[in-house]
């Protein structure tokens, strides 16, 4: 008798069958260039599985199973939610509830991410009436199995209740609110392919609005209706296809629903599209640029379509227009409208005129859909002849020189791609990412952010933000020179080579072609060449050294250049990331500006006179504090000239008041106060010096979540360390006054211990740093005078990094004289001034450099 093989239970067989079908589709998703057919196939396979479960659960024919949302549209990405509605007749037996629960449970067991609702027709209509999300999901409802009559009754009731105008207003408001969550820009470093501005949700929103209004449910139907042109329909289909493919591949690569194009997945996603790294660009940068261009096109076309749909749903009650440029432009309901569809073909110089009128005409709040469409379809007109036309060059300069509206005009020029077609080198950096770990914007967005920051200096209502910058720009003649420099300072990023030198050549050519001559042209070119110099001097060099100030003053040469460079530098740093700027950096730059201005005004950078001035100012402050007249001498007699040059009068007075009674203290004295220059804590440490002191202090800060911004280390003549630190708390909303006493007590107790230095904590790197690690660099060299050694360190930022460096130095008994801690987002560029004793030995230098590289390695 032959043995029979037992058949697997139906549920197991069905699960294996569906799993195999889905796996086969997922494999095809990995390489398919057009995923819409696969999305439909996955939807059909899911339909079949749900029908089978429905029948197995014995659900009666009086019910209906309805697909809603994206599933209703028949489009499923590999790991999308499967949204279903179980539609009930008005009267139904309560025992159905158990069967429905079993059906939904079995669907989950099948591996489907089910989103379910169980409602009658009345309940659906009621829910949709006060929840636009429910109303939207039901718009694309599709029957899978069950009662056709019930489903048709539901759809009839739904359509009768749907108010197209109210739906339009709700969806446009919803879209604006969604865009606001992403700062109204598609240029996020980790965009959400579905939800970000210019993403799939924008395209879906337009089709939902059009469908609700009865205008059609596809790009072809909207084309037929006259809402878009053939060319626009092709562009929409092409970009929609790319975004769908990108989202599907993200799902497959992540093995789950993943709509955010996170750093960790960007390289794999890029490789799935065939991008390969080049000497100039990573594969991920090439993919991201394509994404940004697609999102930008979607944003442009969505704006046109929404305005067109709005015009049909809400016909204008008044046709009153105002002529702005005869035969070219009128103002209609607050929008700039072309007088005829072929204005730009007949008058190419009207293209830039549109932005000048938008900028300069009160009451004009934007460009109409008709104007935007004409711009979009006039790309062929924007050719070399158009760029060389003297009329366009004059208009471009007029746009730059208007008293207001410049930022809005340039942003709109970029959104409509006109700016990149006029400045071809600008077009090259549109959508270009910057993986330098501190820029959080693409190059084009960063440039426009810098332009915006300079403009804000000149706007009275923003004068409270940076009062010193606002004060300077008020008296700065022809500020448009700064705007030109802002446009060109990073325009050569990503070409390979020195972007400052390459950008200089671009700026020089622009000036020549646009009639900018003499000192103005020279200033623009010089600013582009040296736009990084002031921040490097302020943050990496010892600005208490008169030689440093004198050398910088010689480079600058004039007060106008100094002011221009200062304003551009502040705007540039502010335009990299909200995290990079802080008030401490602002103070360093302002101090450098004032010291350089004094030299340019004829003051000689003389250490002796500066020493005398600082001491006199400090004594005046001490008298206000009722410190006895000669009480300061005991401390000051132990301090060298360097101490007085590195600290301002207010700090000298504070430290003297704290220490004049304790010059020969037996125990550590620690005092802390909120920093006078910004949101930070200033910590004073006075204790008998030892080789591991700096490392021990850094260890305490590291363990307590305090980041060091600046360290000024001094050794008195009688062997005491007088160290000053500016630190910030990594947690937000900390009240430094509240933690000052705690820091004083804990740090003093830590310094009283004789325990060995603890092992550095290997803090966790951010995802950005893990994905785009920078090559750590260590440079150790003698300074120009041979008095100290300068240690420069560049690495990914992480908790414990400064202490790791300090510990290596302590182990080799290398003293730290000063430290400039420069944190740029996820990157640090620190500079230390070290005691030269012993470092003249080349073997020790090499050993220290080697161990430092090991300590800072990712």
Swiss-Prot record:
The HD domain, residue ranges: 443-565
Activity regulation summary: Uridylyltransferase (UTase) activity is inhibited by glutamine, while glutamine activates uridylyl-removing (UR) activity.
Catalytic activity: [protein-PII]-L-tyrosine + UTP = [protein-PII]-uridylyl-L-tyrosine + diphosphate; [protein-PII]-uridylyl-L-tyrosine + H2O = [protein-PII]-L-tyrosine + UMP + H(+)
Domain ACT: residue ranges: 682-761, 790-858
EC number: 2.7.7.59, 3.1.4.-
GO BP terms: regulation of nitrogen utilization
Keywords of this entry: Hydrolase, Magnesium, Multifunctional enzyme, Nucleotidyltransferase, Repeat, Transferase
Pfam families: GlnD_UR_UTase, HD, NTP_transf_2
The keyword Cell cycle is assigned to this record: no
GO molecular function annotations of the record: [protein-PII] uridylyltransferase activity; phosphoric diester hydrolase activity
Region of interest called Uridylyltransferase, as start-end residue ranges on this chain: 1-324
Cofactor: Mg(2+)
Family assignment from sequence similarity: Belongs to the GlnD family.
PANTHER family: BIFUNCTIONAL URIDYLYLTRANSFERASE/URIDYLYL-REMOVING ENZYME, BIFUNCTIONAL URIDYLYLTRANSFERASE_URIDYLYL-REMOVING ENZYME
Record remark on domains: Has four distinct domains: an N-terminal nucleotidyltransferase (NT) domain responsible for UTase activity, a central HD domain that encodes UR activity, and two C-terminal ACT domains that seem to have a role in glutamine sensing.
Name of the protein described by the UniProt record: Bifunctional uridylyltransferase/uridylyl-removing enzyme
UniProt source species: Burkholderia pseudomallei (strain 1106a)
Lineage summary: Bacteria, Pseudomonadati, Pseudomonadota, Betaproteobacteria, Burkholderiales
